[in-house]
Amino acid sequence: MSRGISTFRNIGISAHIDSGKTTLSERILFYCDRIHAIHEVRGKDGVGATMDNMELERERGITIQSASTQVQWKGHTINVIDTPGHVDFTIEVERSLRVLDGAVLVLCSVAGVQSQSITVDRQLRRYHVPRISFINKCDRTGANPFKVCAQLREKLSLNAHLMQLPIGLEDRLEGVIDLISLKALYFEGESGAHVREAPIPEQYQADVKKYRDELIDAASLFSDELAEAYLEGTETDQLIRAAVRAGTIAEKFVPVFCGSAYKNKGIQPLLDAITYYLPDPTEVTNTALDLDRAEEPVTLSTDADAPVVALGFKLEDGKYGQLTYVRVYQGTIKKGAELFNVRARKKFKVGRLVRMNSNQMEDISEGTPGDIVALFGVDCASGDTFCSGDLNYAMTSMFVPEPVISLSITPKDKRSADQVSKALNRFTKEDPTFRSFVDPESNQTIIQGMGELHLDVYIERMRREYKCEVETGMPQVAYREAISARADFNYTHKKQTGGSGQFGRVAGFIEPIAGQDYEFVDQIKGGVIPNEFIPSCDKGFRTAVKKGTLIGFPIVGVRVTINDGQSHPVDSSDMAFQAAAIGAFREAYNGAKPVVLEPIMRVSVEGPQEFQGSVFGLINQRRGVVVSSADDEQFSRVDAEVPLSEMFGFSTVLRSSTQGKAEYSMEFAKYGKAPQGVTDSLIKEYQEKRKAEQR
């Protein structure tokens, strides 16, 4: 069986928005005979890219959900995940990387390493995913793959080396030179399907020698055999490839390829590179946590006969019902077999088992180690682990960022109200960064997400997929409250209303802590608060920190210590001590010098150098702090930290200030103390809102 697994490659295609990765995926499908005609991304031909199967994606020309597809190339099975390039959809990238064994990092030959490339690089490192890089758009004006390869080394600190040189650039791009086989490759025919090998043109010989020497010199660090052969002048293609493969799998080397997906140049050698240099499932160490042994890490095997361990990494509710995308790590999932959902503690039977090819599906009878398959009708959440037999393993949970923006939505009519709840139920299951709840005070439905575009897409999906019209309020920032000093409390909760009353006294102090939201410390001695009521105190304090009294947002960074108290043999109860804890916290809170924290975003603005001054001005106007800036002959990039509250409508202002030539991305960086003026206006706004609600 391991021979079959060794031909598997699970790869993701990751990049900055508009680097051309969906176009690249489309060409991969075409050359691997998955589709029989090439469609462009923005749907000029009325079809749209195959991998962009959601109607909204085809219209906007951005990839929102990671479509999964399986292709065959020269005896290898490649599972391709096309991931979104927009920061608002980062959870999709995170989820697909969690189940991949390798990645193709796509870069634009003109723009080079951009802000989202840096985010993707950080994610690849987090999940230890080896990568190769493809410098796309070498046919564009200003294309410079040499500069981009240098940026990979300088900006991302990668040991990146060109494996190919372009033959011509911009509108004169003809093909590529393979630095290992020392052949010129030309892509002929209407769709570049025929690859013609030819001798290297004379004018490129000097460059070929220079870059080949650099490549072998770097690769020989991973192979003593290659180092010796190189000194003796007897190096072979096989030795070089083996050394590059070893360095790539160890995440210490990044082979760089170039071409133009749009012009059908360089895709077949990239497919070869995926099979040559990226690991198969047996070459990747995957671990699970044994829940029966205090979450002790366990290394999984790729034995098809072992008990099943699989991860449900994506949920999708399409025209066929709920689909759960699953990566099989160990054992074989068979149709009709019984599996156990470790989180939900429930067994279920595998009904229909399919393989998804974008939005097409094929029925299969089993999924083996290293495979990515989809299950029908399984009630689960994204990130659930499925096991067979007596295994009680959980795959390490995926990192899920907290939402930073919220929006109130109001259905326009009764029918829409019913559909909204269905839509929200589905979306929150599909996407852990999209959340919804009903505000108990205003009774409004609130949705939360990673940015304006993120929420826009879900509102649009409600309209299209559920035919429900909603009115949206102003976007709201997810503020937090915190304390900046220690304060004592000594609070008695006493209620006598005939019959048994309520009594509980708690004393202690609250103080600020760094690095966590809440900590409870029990220093009660002598049983002045009976042991059974200590959890009640903890529960009461947890309730109190859910909503601060300054502006009504959760309180973070608080340690609560209780060291004294009193109980009554009849009147003390769970509810009495919960109420005492809530009262005690509120008593101490104002004395602990509370402050408002606001989310600070990491903002990257990229555009022509001539607009750099305007960009600095826009950031300064928004209370932003420039962290770094870089520029070359044409482009400049400004990295800044800006409060989220100042970023609403930024895209419109940026467009008008830069003639539409600059773009920006942002992601959550940290919480920071809000200036006094901002705090005062938020407090005033909150007090007015409370008064209005009480009328």
Curated annotation (Swiss-Prot):
Keywords on record: Cytoplasm, Elongation factor, GTP-binding, Nucleotide-binding, Protein biosynthesis
GO cellular component, one term: cytoplasm
Purpose: Catalyzes the GTP-dependent ribosomal translocation step during translation elongation. During this step, the ribosome changes from the pre-translocational (PRE) to the post-translocational (POST) state as the newly formed A-site-bound peptidyl-tRNA and P-site-bound deacylated tRNA move to the P and E sites, respectively. Catalyzes the coordinated movement of the two tRNA molecules, the mRNA and conformational changes in the ribosome.
Pfam families, alphabetized: EFG_C, EFG_III, EFG_IV, GTP_EFTU, GTP_EFTU_D2
Similarity annotation: Belongs to the TRAFAC class translation factor GTPase superfamily. Classic translation factor GTPase family. EF-G/EF-2 subfamily.
Subcellular location as annotated: Cytoplasm
Domain of life: Bacteria
Gene source species: Treponema pallidum (strain Nichols)
InterPro entries: EFG_II, EFG_III, EFG_III/V, EFG_IV, EFG_V-like, EFTu-like_2, G_TR_CS, P-loop_NTPase
SUPFAM superfamilies: EF-G C-terminal domain-like (SSF54980), P-loop containing nucleoside triphosphate hydrolases (SSF52540), Ribosomal protein S5 domain 2-like (SSF54211), Translation proteins (SSF50447)
One GO MF term: translation elongation factor activity
Binding site for GTP: 15-22, 82-86, 136-139
Main location: cytoplasm
Annotated ranges, domain tr-type G: 6-282
Protein name as annotated: Elongation factor G 1
